[in-house]
Amino acid sequence: MATTSSNVENFSPQIIKQVAREIHGLTNDPPEGIKVFSNDEDITDIQASIEGPTGTPYEGGIFKIKLVLGKDFPAAPPKGFFLTKIFHPNVAKNGEICVNTLKKDWKPDLGIKQVLLTVKCLLIVPNPESALNEEAGKLLLERYDDYSKRAKMFTEIHAKLSASSSNNISEGQQESLPGKKRVAVNEKMCDKKKKDKKRALKRL
């Protein structure tokens, strides 16, 4: 049940077909650790769940997110929201996601898959410089252990309630992912950024 009105009537048949095709592909062959739920009644309201990446304060959690396609999509980026409460510098208290891919770095050919991978990468490498949650951004930069404890507590309370019902995202589906290599490259980039960030934080 979307809280925003549908923009389907504002889309050309070509855009509707393009979005429907991509969502269908993502539903049947999702990126690793991500599950996409199709909404036949409103393709402009896309919901997905993301597994908390290993080695982060979000590990073990299942985070539900929503992407809302505006009437100018794909010329304008979708809006992203976490439906699951999360303690993260780039997620506002109302769930709004702040990431450059959804703002100044958006390109019409990026597609829904790239947005989902970017949001997952944000869980691995937060960006405190563009924080929507200033408290989380400050803790990340100045007291990482406190930030990690708070983020883990939020994960434990809010993101693990539905984890048991979504455990099979990574088990049954991961073995048959033809696009896994591309995702692995993306994950390596995230890992490298994470290590660089940790080194930088240690020097502070």
Swiss-Prot record:
GO molecular function, one term: ATP binding
InterPro entries cross-referenced by the UniProt entry: Ub_conjugating_enzyme, UBQ-conjugat_E2_core, UBQ-conjugating_AS, UBQ-conjugating_enzyme/RWD
Keywords from the named record: ATP-binding, Cell cycle, Cell division, Nucleotide-binding, Transferase, Ubl conjugation pathway
Cellular compartments per GO CC: anaphase-promoting complex; nucleus
Record flagged with keyword Nucleus: no
Domain of life: Eukaryota
SMART domains: UBCc
Pfam families: UQ_con
Keyword Nucleotide-binding belongs to the record: yes
Domain UBC core: 14-160
Residue ranges, annotated region (Disordered): 165-204
Biased composition (Basic residues): 191-204
Catalytic reactions on record: S-ubiquitinyl-[E1 ubiquitin-activating enzyme]-L-cysteine + [E2 ubiquitin-conjugating enzyme]-L-cysteine = [E1 ubiquitin-activating enzyme]-L-cysteine + S-ubiquitinyl-[E2 ubiquitin-conjugating enzyme]-L-cysteine
Catalytic residues (positions): 98 (glycyl thioester intermediate)
Biased composition annotated in UniProt, kind: Polar residues: 165-176
Involved pathway(s): Protein modification; protein ubiquitination
EC number annotated for this UniProt entry: 2.3.2.23
PANTHER family in the cross-refs: UBIQUITIN-CONJUGATING ENZYME E2 (PTHR24067)
Annotated function: Catalyzes the covalent attachment of ubiquitin to other proteins. Acts as an essential factor of the anaphase promoting complex/cyclosome (APC/C), a cell cycle-regulated ubiquitin ligase that controls progression through mitosis. Acts by specifically elongating polyubiquitin chains initiated by the E2 enzyme UBCH10 on APC/C substrates, enhancing the degradation of APC/C substrates by the proteasome and promoting mitotic exit.
Name this protein carries in UniProt: Ubiquitin-conjugating enzyme E2 S
Species whose genome carries this gene: Nematostella vectensis
